[in-house]
Amino acid sequence: MYTDQMRRAFHSIIPPNNFQVELIDNEHFLTIKLDEYVFARMAHDDKIQALQYVLNAKKALEMEGAIVLVTREAIK
């Protein structure tokens, strides 16, 4: 399901410093997975920038026809 156009759209969005997500290709949809441990240690303004990045990446993928789920791994 993850096409070359989706890859280009996803990589055109620049992530904030020291923040990355995992993009998982499920057969019928894509998942953007946040690392909650990294996210929890971020300053407030950095969290806002990170979430804006995730929303922009989600929107870019959806513009290329993807169904996108955003999730995180819970801290235990």
Where are the language model's segments positioned?
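N-proximal, solvent-exposed amphipathic alpha-helical segments enriched in charged/polar residues
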Residues: 1-19
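Generic short N-terminal amphipathic or hydrophobic helices
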Residues: 12-13, 23, 31, 74
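Generic structural motif
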Residues: 17-25, 68-72
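Short aromatic-glycine-(Arg/Gly/Cys) micro-motifs in beta-strand/loop hairpins
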Residues: 20-39
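Short, surface-exposed beta-strand/loop "edge" segments at domain boundaries and coil↔beta transitions
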Residues: 37-42, 76
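A short, charged, amphipathic alpha-helix used as a generic interaction element across diverse proteins
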Residues: 45-64
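A short amphipathic beta-strand at an alpha->beta junction
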Residues: 59-76
